[in-house]
């Protein structure tokens, strides 16, 4: 286990673990070595971008996003390129995902839900005014900063998840239909603004109710419910909240409430604080032009450096609030898409136990040394769930197991982890047991 670990650098950024992965892009945590600031690094494969004729669309959207400077939108700092990759440097949401709050605490109090919804509408309205649409609003895109303010990610980068066909209309293959508007599912082409607002309505419903308005184990039945606008509000919703949700979740995009009308709604306006920020007059687009002109003189330097494996795993565990599985999702520097716990036994035995626990849950498993990638074989109605695990040695008989989501629905990840943790309960190291460390 005491093998060297590869440390990757891209220009001034020291690249860390994978946070998420899609068809065209992978997102990694990184640190700006000049400032110490944590960032998210979205990595695109140039070959795939060119193959799907997406270069010009992505270039336009990146140029637009560099002009966006809103407190509720994840900032796009700069764009870099190597010979084979494009790197988009983004603001890092240190407070984790908003929907982790739902998983931990259940539905939110109305005043808290309203605050987040107001911030969401602020972000969406501002971006729409600049001609930028999201088209894929879902829990994974709703992050929090260190102060607990909402940050919407992936605004303007919709070319990575959409297709424009010969009719000139927007068409999306939707991996998470629960949040998609009826006109998106009908695939007849749609307006990005009204579709975004529908998704905001679904998000508001979940914040207030603690569950999805449209849910069914059968995908076709789910589609029918969404297209018909068939859902039921829980009895605890206030009349004002219910009225607004009904007006947003109108299956007819022509009669659906608009954002200006939402801003004038009595329930929405309560304790409303408009976003305060300074507009950028201009943004430097030289880095974007250099990336898409593919000028070799502007290519960023990529380095891989070998470093010894960190031996502070036990310190990390000791610093945690609890060492057992009662605290399922520990924060690591504020980010909550992962959990970790101490486990007894040899590393190879732990790998086998994780494999044995995951296979009955329908996961395909890839192993490389003490890292594993788990993916559910058949995508459900919420798309594929991908999970990465890694085992770190503390002593020959004590290890730290890290489990993190790399793709998919947050709620599904939490469900998977609970099942996995139950299966591994016999090997979890509890506080007070012998650690196997020499005194």
Curated annotation (Swiss-Prot):
GO CC aspect terms: plasma membrane; plastid
Catalytic activity reported: L-seryl-[protein] + ATP = O-phospho-L-seryl-[protein] + ADP + H(+); L-threonyl-[protein] + ATP = O-phospho-L-threonyl-[protein] + ADP + H(+)
Sequence positions that bind ATP: 19-27, 42
PROSITE patterns with a match to the protein in the record: NAF (PS50816), PROTEIN_KINASE_ATP (PS00107), PROTEIN_KINASE_DOM (PS50011), PROTEIN_KINASE_ST (PS00108)
Keywords, sorted A to Z: ATP-binding, Cell membrane, Kinase, Manganese, Membrane, Nucleotide-binding, Phosphoprotein, Serine/threonine-protein kinase, Transferase
Function, in words: CIPK serine-threonine protein kinases interact with CBL proteins. Binding of a CBL protein to the regulatory NAF domain of CIPK protein lead to the activation of the kinase in a calcium-dependent manner. Involved in the calcium-dependent regulation of reactive oxygen species production by the NADPH oxidase RBOHF.
Enzyme Commission number: 2.7.11.1
Entry text on domains: The activation loop within the kinase domain is the target of phosphorylation/activation by upstream protein kinases. The PPI motif mediates the interaction with the ABI (abscisic acid-insensitive) phosphatases.
The protein's assembly and partners: Interacts with RBOHF (via N-terminus).
Modified residues (Phosphoserine): 158
Active site: 136 (proton acceptor)
Class of this enzyme: transferase
Modified residues (Phosphothreonine): 172
Domain Protein kinase: 13-268
Subcellular location: Cell membrane
Region annotated PPI, chain positions: 336-365
GO MF annotations in UniProt: ATP binding; protein serine kinase activity; protein serine/threonine kinase activity
Official protein name in the record: CBL-interacting serine/threonine-protein kinase 26
GO biological process, one term: signal transduction
Region of interest (Activation loop), residue spans: 154-183
Cofactor dependence: Mn(2+)
Family the UniProt entry places it in: Belongs to the protein kinase superfamily. CAMK Ser/Thr protein kinase family. SNF1 subfamily.
Protein origin, superkingdom: Eukaryota
């Amino acid at each position: 286990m005491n093998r060297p670990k590869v440390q990757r650098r891209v220009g001034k950024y020291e690249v860390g673990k994978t946070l998420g992965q899609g068809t065209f892009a992978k997102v990694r945590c990184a640190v700006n070595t000049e400032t110490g600031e944590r960032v998210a690094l979205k990595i695109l494969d140039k070959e795939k971008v060119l193959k799907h004729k997406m270069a010009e669309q992505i270039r336009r959207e990146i140029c637009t996003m560099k002009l966006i400077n809103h407190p509720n939108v994840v900032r796009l700092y700069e764009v870099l390129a190597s010979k084979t990759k494009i790197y988009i440097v983004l603001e890092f949401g240190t407070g984790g995902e908003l929907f982790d709050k739902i998983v931990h605490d259940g539905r939110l109090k109305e005043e808290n839900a309203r605050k987040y919804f107001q911030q969401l509408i602020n972000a969406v309205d501002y971006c729409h005014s600049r001609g930028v649409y999201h088209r894929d609003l879902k829990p994974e895109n709703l992050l929090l900063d260190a102060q607990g303010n909402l940050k919407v990610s992936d605004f303007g980068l919709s070319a990575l998840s959409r297709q424009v066909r010969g009719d000139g209309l927007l068409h999306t293959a939707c991996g998470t239909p629960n949040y998609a508007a009826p006109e998106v599912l009908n695939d007849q082409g749609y307006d990005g603004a009204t579709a975004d607002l529908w998704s905001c309505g679904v998000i508001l419903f979940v914040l207030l109710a603690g569950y999805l308005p449209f849910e069914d184990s059968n995908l076709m039945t789910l589609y029918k419910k969404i297209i018909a606008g068939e859902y039921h509000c829980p009895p605890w919703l206030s009349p004002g909240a219910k009225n607004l949700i009904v007006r947003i979740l109108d299956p007819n995009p022509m009669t659906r409430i608009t954002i200006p009308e939402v801003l004038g709604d009595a329930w929405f306006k309560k304790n409303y604080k408009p976003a305060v920020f300074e507009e950028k007059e201009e943004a430097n687009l030289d880095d974007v032009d250099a990336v898409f002109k593919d000028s070799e003189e502007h290519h960023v330097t990529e380095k891989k450096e070998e470093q010894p494996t960190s031996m502070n795993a036990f310190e990390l565990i000791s610093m945690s609030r609890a060492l057992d599985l009662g605290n399922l999702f520990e924060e690591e520097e504020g980010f909550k898409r992962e959990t970790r716990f101490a486990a007894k036994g040899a590393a190879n035995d732990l790998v086998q136990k994780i494999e044995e626990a995951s296979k009955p849950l329908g996961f395909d498993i890839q192993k490389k040394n003490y890292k594993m990638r788990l993916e559910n074989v058949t995508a459900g109605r919420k798309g594929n769930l991908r999970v990465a695990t890694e085992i770190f040695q503390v002593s020959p008989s004590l290890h730290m197991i890290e489990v993190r989501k790399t793709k998919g629905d947050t709620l599904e990840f939490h469900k998977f982890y609970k099942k996995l943790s139950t299966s591994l309960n016999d090997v979890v190291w509890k506080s007070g047991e012998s650690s196997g460390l020499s005194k």
